[in-house]
Amino acid sequence: MHQEGKDEDAAKALLDYYRARTNVKTPDINLNKVTISKEEQQWADDGLKHTFFVHKGYQPSYNYGEDINWQYWPVKDNELRWQLHRHKWFTPMGKAYRISGDEKYAKEWAHQYIDWIKKNPLVKMDKKEYELVSDGKIKGEVENVRFAWRPLEVSNRLQDQTSQFQLFLPSPSFTPDFLTEFLVNYYKHAVHILANYSDQGNHLLFEAQRMIYAGAFFPEFKDAPAWRKSGIDILNREIHVQVYEDGGQFELDPHYHLAAINIFCKALGIADTNGFRKEFPQDYLDTIENMIMFYANISFPDYTNPCFSDAKLTTKKEMVKNYKSWSKLFPKNQAIKYFATE
């Protein structure tokens, strides 16, 4: 249809295709059993009024105006600016829509999604500027790109938008025109990461794992196999570069270590769901198991972690959930099974 110049018909047919598609899934969301916490419901409802949950360290959340100002920076903390572009309230809006059936959530999500695209153009910039090496010297659209298009934030959106796509897909607000804008934007995100991967560390792991999501969830893109392969190749390489023989992640930070475990596991989750687990060798799993035991051995009896380096405190509830998840991967490991019980 597209080749015949019938773009509107092609977009409608593509939307019908995605609404009927059943062969691609993500482990993050079960559409038959959507649940929402009280906190997520609050984020969704606040989001309708453009009061966006960005960071737990800055509460109550800030309002970004009726005409959203994506460059609003109420406190000059880089994290507040970066994390705005992770759109943490979008998936809760999707859950609220699915549970309530109220179209206001879908309509507002589609509006904010397009508004973000319009107001955050990707302009050319030296890759090193994503780490703010020329702080204070860059202004305007280029300055905004450092925050809106930093590869870590882009990868956040790549992953989370697979859930949002599924949650909002049945909505009348998810029009053929919107689908076209969504797919063009999503493609731009993946291409951007491919050319701007972080050099090392947990950021590189996050980006690689989320490129696997992009390639697995949208296999219809011609470049999807290359996206998936790039992520898998990086994780298979970096699990040996970043993890010492004793199981410790080389940034020597308990929180980054925990994040790395879950990144490696998340990649296995999307692989299992979509049938490409064999692309991860046995020593990949062995290393994850070693990392889990390392983490258990540096944790306190109440499941919390020591807070050195850039670490933040975990909770027992969060860690029991982690151990339960890990125990499914390593059912023969009695120590992990022990920590998974209370």
Where are the regions that the model predicts?
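Short amphipathic alpha-helical segments at helix-loop
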Residues: 74-77, 142-146, 174, 219, ...
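Alpha-helical scaffold segments in carbohydrate-active enzymes
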Residues: 115, 160-163, 167, 185-195, ...
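Alpha-helix capping and helix-loop boundary segments enriched in small/acidic/polar residues
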Residues: 148-152, 177-181, 198-202, 222-227, ...
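Extracellular glycan-targeting catalytic surfaces
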Residues: 1-199, 205-212
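Short secondary-structure junctions and interdomain/linker hinges
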Residues: 21, 25, 116, 123, ...
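Structural helix-adjacent loops and short alpha-helical linkers that scaffold large soluble proteins
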Residues: 96-110, 165-187, 215-233, 271-289, ...
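Carbohydrate-active enzyme catalytic cores, enriched for enzymes
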Residues: 244, 248-342
